[in-house]
């Protein structure tokens, strides 16, 4: 979601808000760089103001929902005692919204609010599109991080990232080193996005193909097997597991096994990010 686009369009329409409701997280891209050839809709660049504008739109949309639904729940709670804890949770959330804050930033439990399909219960990620000077400005970054906390803040130069994406891996590594950048911004965005969504990766390796699979944090070995094929989950017996780090450190599967790093796990095993797995199953 681009801040300037929403400002230009004078707010978010119902269709746009509906699309956000279906999302699992909100990633807001905010312009920070100054460029006379790229006009900002407000005539000046102020990322703090842009973020406040979008936040206000989302908060007002949630308040509208809350003001419509809360009285109904309050009437229900007058008859059903079991509804009273939910009323308290909704009233607490409404108070946060009335302060102009998102429910996510207040750290409230989103579970009691699930039926409302609110926008600001979702986790937020902020991407600041900067120039190279801003990428080297620790004070500027600290200010932006404080502004959006507890959300994750990612700083990148989109033009730089576009050039990087066109390069061969060796040239890209040299380009990053010359710029004093340890990690491409898009790589960090992918990593933070995975973490924010509660996702992780495991790997399978065979003679014909090696591939990564996406699962949720906390998934067990049978659940991970089911991502590959439902038969793997139904007939799950064991999982042969080694971490990717150990595989690299010891130079291969046989070497990792000799070092005692290869193990068999059962149905209760909770998958870890970077596990390299061979599933044993019976159909």
Regions found by a protein language model. Give the residues of each.
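Short alpha-helical basic/polar micro-motif
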Residues: 14, 18, 64, 222-223, ...
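Extended, highly charged alpha-helical segments
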Residues: 48, 53-90
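Conserved P-loop NTPase nucleotide-binding/switch module
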Residues: 8-11, 15-58
């Amino acid at each position: 979601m681009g801040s300037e686009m929403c400002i230009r369009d004078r707010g978010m329409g119902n269709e746009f808000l509906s699309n956000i409701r279906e999302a699992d997280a909100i990633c807001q891209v905010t312009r920070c760089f100054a460029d006379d050839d790229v006009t900002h809709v407000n005539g000046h660049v102020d990322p703090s103001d842009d973020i406040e504008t979008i936040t206000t739109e989302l908060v007002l949309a949630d308040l509208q929902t809350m003001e419509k639904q809360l009285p109904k729940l309050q009437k229900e709670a007058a008859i059903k005692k079991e509804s009273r804890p939910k009323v308290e949770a909704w009233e607490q959330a409404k108070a946060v919204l009335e302060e102009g804050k998102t429910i996510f930033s207040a750290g409230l439990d989103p579970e009691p609010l699930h039926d409302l399909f609110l926008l600001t219960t979702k986790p937020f990620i902020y991407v600041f599109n900067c120039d190279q000077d801003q990428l080297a400005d620790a004070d500027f970054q600290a200010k932006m991080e404080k502004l959006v906390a507890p959300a994750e803040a990612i700083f990148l130069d989109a033009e730089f990232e576009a050039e990087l994406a066109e390069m061969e891996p060796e040239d890209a590594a040299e380009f990053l080193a010359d710029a004093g950048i340890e990690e491409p911004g898009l790589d960090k965005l992918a990593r933070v996005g995975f973490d924010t969504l509660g996702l992780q990766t495991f790997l399978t390796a065979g003679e014909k193909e090696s591939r990564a699979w996406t699962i949720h944090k906390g998934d067990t070995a049978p659940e991970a097997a089911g991502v590959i094929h439902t038969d793997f989950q139904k007939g799950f017996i064991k999982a042969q597991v080694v971490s990717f780090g150990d595989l690299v450190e010891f130079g291969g599967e046989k070497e990792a096994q000799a070092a005692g790093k290869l193990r068999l796990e059962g149905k209760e095993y909770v998958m870890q990010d970077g596990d390299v797995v061979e599933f044993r199953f019976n159909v």
